[in-house]
Amino acid sequence: MRFTSIEAVALTAVSLASADELAYSPPYYPSPWANGQGDWAEAYQRAVDIVSQMTLAEKVNLTTGTGWELELCVGQTGGVPRLGIPGMCAQDSPLGVRDSDYNSAFPAGVNVAATWDKNLAYLRGQAMGQEFSDKGADIQLGPAAGPLGRSPDGGRNWEGFSPDPALSGVLFAETIKGIQDAGVVATAKHYIAYEQEHFRQAPEAQGYGFNITESGSANLDDKTMHELYLWPFADAIRAGAGAVMCSYNQINNSYGCQNSYTLNKLLKAELGFQGFVMSDWAAHHAGVSGALAGLDMSMPGDVDYDSGTSYWGTNLTISVLNGTVPQWRVDDMAVRIMAAYYKVGRDRLWTPPNFSSWTRDEYGFKYYYVSEGPYEKVNQFVNVQRNHSELIRRIGADSTVLLKNDGALPLTGKERLVALIGEDAGSNPYGANGCSDRGCDNGTLAMGWGSGTANFPYLVTPEQAISNEVLKNKNGVFTATDNWAIDQIEALAKTASVSLVFVNADSGEGYINVDGNLGDRRNLTLWRNGDNVIKAAASNCNNTIVIIHSVGPVLVNEWYDNPNVTAILWGGLPGQESGNSLADVLYGRVNPGAKSPFTWGKTREAYQDYLYTEPNNGNGAPQEDFVEGVFIDYRGFDKRNETPIYEFGYGLSYTTFNYSNLQVEVLSAPAYEPASGETEAAPTFGEVGNASDYLYPDGLQRITKFIYPWLNSTDLEASSGDASYGQDASDYLPEGATDGSAQPILPAGGGAGGNPRLYDELIRVSVTIKNTGKVAGDEVPQLYVSLGGPNEPKIVLRQFERITLQPSKETQWSTTLTRRDLANWNVETQDWEITSYPKMVFAGSSSRKLPLRASLPTVH
């Protein structure tokens, strides 16, 4: 079954088309132009002032990458040297500077989610931003809230935060603030509904033997889009994100980087996005269509990697000269790019890139792939780590979730013989960076694989850190790190005072195949014989502690309730300080306060199967129908009355907490008013000129395959090299696509993140929390709301806070619920509304431990 339209879903019921119909994404034109609203005003005006001085070719130069593997960064635009504007360096990844050296390898986004700590999210973002800035990168290609985590086995879930949109949204926003406060443009990605690696790109899928010709299509209804997948991006826009990266997949059978509904309507018109939309690498599929649908920057610039051809560059210049793309659209692209640059203060901090993404050699050709240009110093080996190892270690410890503890932890340091068991305890025999883009599972797992990685400056393994602890106390430590040497594992476990067993499960981006996992995991089991390693140790040692390093949930049902398994910890993907972070928790220097950012089911079937791994549409685009709507992770478990092993939000401590005294207070707030009125007409800046103004400059030494904005000839058809050049634009351009007249403001729009009235605080909720144990510890009070409708989740997370309490001390935690927190999306009015269904609020320590509840008063 396939959805007929993103708007064709009633508020309380999904309307499905017949099986032979494909989902359809309705057109929305024209592409909204930036207006500098809110705190963008100063940056917008500066951008207008500089863009007004640019020629058409100079504007185009800002919009188009110069080509894959040509300049130093993984993506680099042209600049405007005449006006002192450099080409902009865009660099991966969401957890650190990729393809570089002397940089930090931070914990992954999923670990930040496990901290439930807004301040740590900000500090991590700020620290990463500092390192990107110091390396000469202007744009960080992160953070990610797409994938959100529709399927627990989605390959890149770990790059983002959590399948809960509220938790993801808050930490997404804080990360963006941190990055941009360090003077680097943050890129909110991957927009949108990019939830699996299978079929994300047709050429990649063809390489794996799948006979498809188009990327897979994520098919979802408007309610699901707004209440789940768009939610964290609204938080990102409200936080001032300078860039948004559109994704590889199609959304309702329209590619993410030329989908006018998701880019023009949702992102720019409804959420009021003022920055620029950048394509993911090779996700740009059409020149004019992409420009008019809201794409602002093409990366890495070429049609295919290293092809030397581009949908934009020269072709965008031609499209403006012949009137196919209006001047106001390319002006808007340039203004958006420059406004983001100015908003973060990049002009004050700019430094040229001091590293090469393509080689670690000190010297090389300036234009790497074609071995052209001067032979010069391309790597300056600048150490940008500062003191970030301290923060990384803290986040690693504060994100370690204690899932089970039968009195085994914390360790006392007096254990006479400690057994370290499992490959995940030790080093990769090829070195921490021995597998390209971490594309293997050898040794301890501290990040997944793909473009969302960074080189480790070092990696402290659990074996190193724990051995240091044991030897410091003059006790014995022995290792068994061959996961198939079961006899040796059993023999060692028999002699141990405590057996620490290390297991893992990996995943990553689809261009790398690890043990038959094409990015997405094939299943949720532990890798490399992990279950048998645990059972071998536990059958011979009555004090077996299991440590899991994984990209998400794994199946623990075979051994979690074994009485000899006395403790279980999830360490996630903790980055370079992995072993030290874990030792801090094991030995009680840090009291665990982390909470699971996802649900641990008893079986893979408990999650339902949302991952499409076989083509289902002939050789056309595989159709990925999001038939579950908003019911993913704990929402789906609740709906199906499925009992998890460990619920969303669950996590133990070395102390205990008590919740009491829930109070609810209605706050004074303005009435909700749908936004109304019209925009100004699209402004233009400067003159376009004639084709003769944009011929290649005399004396230019052209670089092979480099993407330029200039023309070979004043004959535009000859300059384009397009066999279909001259086709009447009215034959293929949607109605209104080039209309620069004033446009109506959407009811749900009018401000950053949507209608400003959505963020009015309507209700204050307070709870008393007491530390009833004997040691200080962190707790994360969680506030859930029931929206009351018959087809709504039983509860949805809305607020949380990580707090520290000394023993026997208590505090009153107070938070507020906004209009958005209490509203549903109405597909008929195309606006948010607080329904008349009775609503309740719940408070507690996890999604299934909510001792306090109260009815909410009626608000509007």
From Swiss-Prot:
Keyword Secreted: yes
EC number(s) per entry: 3.2.1.21
Localisation: Secreted
Domain of life: Eukaryota
Enzyme class: hydrolase
A GO term, aspect molecular function: beta-glucosidase activity
Main location (coarse class): secreted
Keywords for this protein: Carbohydrate metabolism, Cellulose degradation, Glycoprotein, Glycosidase, Hydrolase, Polysaccharide degradation, Secreted, Signal
SMART domains: Fn3_like
A cellular component term, taken from the record's GO annotations: extracellular region
GO biological process terms held by the UniProt record: carbohydrate catabolic process; cellulose catabolic process
Active site (catalytic residues): D280
Functional pathway: Glycan metabolism; cellulose degradation
Reactions performed catalytically: Hydrolysis of terminal, non-reducing beta-D-glucosyl residues with release of beta-D-glucose
Matching InterPro entries: Cellulose_deg_GH3, Fn3-like, Glyco_hydro_3_AS, Glyco_hydro_3_C, Glyco_hydro_3_C_sf, Glyco_hydro_3_N, Glyco_hydro_3_N_sf, Glycoside_hydrolase_SF
Keyword Signal part of the UniProt annotation: yes
Signal peptide: 1-19
Glycosylation sites recorded in the entry for this protein: N61, N211, N252, N315, N322, N354, N387, N442, N523, N542, N564, N658, N690, N712
PANTHER family, per the entry: BETA-GLUCOSIDASE, BETA-GLUCOSIDASE A-RELATED
Function: Beta-glucosidases are one of a number of cellulolytic enzymes involved in the degradation of cellulosic biomass. Catalyzes the last step releasing glucose from the inhibitory cellobiose.
Family to which the UniProt record says this protein belongs: Belongs to the glycosyl hydrolase 3 family.
Protein name: Probable beta-glucosidase A
Source species of the chain: Aspergillus niger (strain ATCC MYA-4892 / CBS 513.88 / FGSC A1513)
Gene name linked to the record: bglA
